[in-house]
Swiss-Prot record:
Keywords: Chloroplast, Plastid, Ribonucleoprotein, Ribosomal protein, RNA-binding, rRNA-binding. It comes from Chaetosphaeridium globosum. This is Large ribosomal subunit protein uL23c. Gene3D superfamilies: 3.30.70.330. Pfam families: Ribosomal_L23. The lineage of its organism: Eukaryota, Viridiplantae, Streptophyta, Coleochaetophyceae, Coleochaetales.
Length: 91
C-alpha cells in the first residue's frame, strides 16, 4: 500500500487544513477510501474520523508546438480524531 501513496501534499490549503487536524495526500487513482483508512490507522496508529477524496481536472500544457495535459492524480484528505497527529506533517 505504501507504494500507492505518492506524497503528502503541502499547499496553502493543505497547510491551513492542518489546523483542523486534516491531512492531505496524493495517491494513485486506484486507491479507495476504505483501503486508505485501514492503512493510515495501522501505519500511523491514529483514529481516522473521515476521508474525503477528489480527482482534480487535468490542465492543458503547451511546450512550443507540442500540447498535452498534466498527469491526473487523486487527492485524499484525512480527518483525524482530536489529539491524534501524523508526525510526517509536523511543522
Amino acid at each position: 500500500m505504501i507504494d500507492k501513496v505518492k506524497s503528502p501534499l503541502l499547499t496553502e490549503k493543505s497547510i491551513r487544513l492542518l489546523q483542523k487536524n486534516q491531512y492531505t495526500f496524493q495517491v494513485n487513482s486506484d486507491v479507495n477510501k476504505t483501503e486508505f483508512k485501514k492503512w493510515i490507522e495501522i501505519f500511523f496508529k491514529v483514529k481516522v474520523m473521515s476521508i474525503n477524496s477528489c480527482r482534480p481536472p487535468r490542465k492543458k500544457k503547451r511546450i512550443g508546438l507540442i500540447s498535452g495535459y498534466t498527469v491526473r492524480y487523486k487527492k485524499i484528505i484525512v480527518t483525524l480524531k482530536s489529539g491524534d497527529s501524523i508526525p510526517l506533517f509536523s511543522i
